Amino acid sequence: MAAMKTADIRAMTPDQMDDAITSLKKERFNLRFQRATGQLENTSRMREARRDIARIKTIAAQKRDAKK
């Protein structure tokens, strides 16, 4: 899964954002185990997943603040 584009995230509904965050957190969990057991080949994916989560949370906060 490639890094998420900002435009794609902005087009998401709040429920879709929550689902995306949940799936990315599960992916990070699995990546941590792969790293611990020496099976992780693409180490940069851990960084991408962490930043995707932050990107989604940032845009969600911006949308929430814009409604006020």
Curated annotation (Swiss-Prot):
PROSITE patterns named among the record's database cross-references: RIBOSOMAL_L29 (PS00579)
Biological process annotations from GO: translation
Endpoints of the signal sequence: none
InterPro entries: Ribosomal_protein_uL29, Ribosomal_uL29, Ribosomal_uL29_CS, Ribosomal_uL29_sf
Pfam families from the UniProt entry: Ribosomal_L29
GO molecular-function terms, A-Z: structural constituent of ribosome
One Gene Ontology cellular component annotation held by this UniProt entry: cytosolic large ribosomal subunit
UniProt keyword annotations, A-Z: Ribonucleoprotein, Ribosomal protein
SUPFAM superfamilies for the chain: Ribosomal protein L29 (L29p) (SSF46561)
Similarity remark: Belongs to the universal ribosomal protein uL29 family.
The name this protein goes by in its record: Large ribosomal subunit protein uL29
Organism encoding this protein: Nitrobacter winogradskyi (strain ATCC 25391 / DSM 10237 / CIP 104748 / NCIMB 11846 / Nb-255)
